[in-house]
Amino acid sequence: MGQESSKPVWPNPTGGYQSNTGRRYGRRHAYVSFRPPTSQRERIASQRKTNSEVPMHRSAPSQTTKRSRSPFSTTRRSWDDSESSGTNLNIDNEDYSRYPPREYRASGSRRGMAYGHIDSYGADDSEEEGAGPVERPPVRGKTGKFKDDKLYDPEKGARSLAGPPPHFSSFSRDVREERDKLDPVPAARCSASRADFLPQSSVASQSSSEGKLATKGDSSERERREQNLPARPSRAPVSICGGGENTSKSAEEPVVRPKIRNLASPNCVKPKIFFDTDDDDDMPHSTSRWRDTANDNEGHSDGLARRGRGESSSGYPEPKYPEDKREARSDQVKPEKVPRRRRTMADPDFWTHSDDYYKYCDEDSDSDKEWIAALRRKYRSREQTLSSSGESWETLPGKEEREPPQAKVSASTGTSPGPGASASAGAGAGASAGSNGSNYLEEVREPSLQEEQASLEEGEIPWLQYHENDSSSEGDNDSGHELMQPGVFMLDGNNNLEDDSSVSEDLEVDWSLFDGFADGLGVAEAISYVDPQFLTYMALEERLAQAMETALAHLESLAVDVEVANPPASKESIDALPEILVTEDHGAVGQEMCCPICCSEYVKGEVATELPCHHYFHKPCVSIWLQKSGTCPVCRCMFPPPL
């Protein structure tokens, strides 16, 4: 699928490719070497001499309509008389090429060199790294051009900064061909000019290539503008560069990193959006910003080699930004507050809230506090909208007095600048509407209460007023007037008990006032906002409890009077009672199966007695009773009987 889009322009070398694996900093990666065997170089180079070549620093965007799914993509190379460091590698993998390398994204101006997601050189494998060249993508300028300033000399094993060595005829022909295209020159002259760049002395080529390198960058830029090529190529070319300043001749194989990524092509069939996980404050996101930075740095094209020489020995380009250039770029972007445009089209089915993400997250780093505050205002306004709906709650006392200030606060919050201003304003309107609804319910409810009070008969307990605002608990508990205590039941419009477990428990009620129910007003002062019918039930229950206490006290007084009227029996009369010996267990003594005083059955060997009224008891039980009261415990007959 789409393999024809990534076929090499030139046939594969007959010598084949060599592959090896290496270990970098604890992580294992596969490195592919594209250098054919030494014996096959001349034969491969001779096959390439007659082919007309496309400039190696540029790739055609219209050529890639489909992408290869292989993580190790096919490449386009040109092998000539010797190893050419100007050859390019196109990474066409969709999964590995959507994201630009970190250093590539961080380069705001045209850099001499960049690298893409490769490991740091460790101390233990510095020789291994310095032995072979590293394949790296050239930095893309803000006009979409890729610049190379690092050349690798396979014969010397070192990077050439001044110019191409005598064996770099392919690279020299590319520069000459590009300059000849700007001027209408026959093809024969182009071929003849290439022959001029065949093997020369190393000193002469190095002294003359310094201007050619700058000319290559300028000519490629002019050719870009003349042909109106898009600023986003479909493939990111990768140039072969040296791995160290002083490399040995033993290991010269160029290494290709499979994890190098390039920007997504505008010709993709299904564009996808991606969110940068790295710190991308230095990455220019719009084409205009790329072009502006390129124009600012137009005079620095000759500084590519200088930046290349300023690199570390391991071959890493250090990000060097002039302070004035960074400040100018920050001043250019920050006042605009324009959301950054991604280089790929957004898929509407992939991220639903991508606009909000761009709105709050894609601005500069100094705007983080603004969108956090906006989200907080939106969240608070949503809470106020939910809490201010007075139609679904029972109207509570004092709420109508405190609702207008809350509505004003919500409205003032809504007028504050920010994305959540409209939501806050809507919340304030909802709060005011809730307060108006509460006032309307109160006005409708008050006349009905007055009519019911007027129709009460004498002796009935009136419904307690709960609209009075002079109670002490209302002034102390501001949050308790709008939220009910779970223990104190909440009633709806029909006075039906409802259990709402989500209400707050901040309500503090002085439950000691429940002890003062003599007049039924203590609870009304403590919880005056509770439904009056509920308080009526509580008052009735308290009245019944008081009546029971009065009845019990009366019965006790009657018992005392009886005891006073019946004095205890004399000791002689108690001893004169007859004794009856129980002969069998659980046997009936007289008509009784058990003693009425201790309620226990008669057991064999116990002593029972009979009173003159013919009631039987245990003699010890009835003796104690008669010492307190001279009556029968069952029938209250006098003992001893009167004469």
Curated annotation (Swiss-Prot):
Cross-referenced Gene3D superfamilies, in alphabetical order?
Zinc/RING finger domain, C3HC4 (zinc finger)
Q: InterPro entries, alphabetically?
A: Znf_RING, Znf_RING/FYVE/PHD
Q: Which SUPFAM superfamilies does the UniProt entry name for this protein?
A: RING/U-box
A Pfam family annotated for this UniProt entry: zf-RING_2
UniProt protein name:
E3 ubiquitin-protein ligase Praja-1
**Residues found modified as Phosphothreonine:** T277
- Signal peptide positions on this chain: none
Q: How is it modified after translation?
A: Substrate for E2-dependent ubiquitination.
EC number(s) for this protein?
A: 2.3.2.27
Q: Which organism is it from?
A: Homo sapiens (Human)
Give the protein's function: Has E2-dependent E3 ubiquitin-protein ligase activity. Ubiquitinates MAGED1 antigen leading to its subsequent degradation by proteasome. May be involved in protein sorting.
Q: What is known of its domains?
A: The RING-type zinc finger domain interacts with an ubiquitin-conjugating enzyme (E2) and facilitates ubiquitination.
Q: Which domain of life is it from?
A: Eukaryota
Where does the chain cross the membrane? none
Question: What ranges does the record give for the region Disordered, renumbered to this chain?
Answer: 1-363, 380-454
